[in-house]
């Protein structure tokens, strides 16, 4: 399971990141938008790593969203 950390910025935007995948961070106008974007980006990063024979964190097919 990959953890998604999410927080609200001072300007009202939401930021979501996956700590186990450095650089996987997105913004959204809503919490849901930020989470959906970061999940999609994380899956693309994992697929790219697999395609290039790189190691990936041991994960299931789920994300755990934490405030």
Question: What feature does the model see in each segment?
Answer:
Residues 7-21:
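Short aromatic-glycine-(Arg/Gly/Cys) micro-motifs in beta-strand/loop hairpins
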Residues 20-23, 58:
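Hydrophobic residues in alpha-helical membrane-spanning segments
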Residues 1-3, 32, 36-67:
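Short, charged, surface-exposed hinge/linker loops at domain edges
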Residues 22-33:
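A short, exposed loop/beta-hairpin motif centered on an aromatic-Gly-Thr core
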């Amino acid at each position: 399971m990959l953890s998604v950390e999410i927080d609200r910025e001072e300007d009202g935007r939401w930021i979501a990141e996956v700590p186990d995948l450095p650089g996987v961070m997105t913004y959204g106008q809503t919490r849901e938008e930020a989470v959906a974007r970061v999940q999609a980006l994380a899956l693309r990063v994992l697929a790219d790593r697999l395609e290039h024979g790189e190691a990936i964190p041991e994960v299931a097919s789920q994300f755990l969203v934490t405030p």
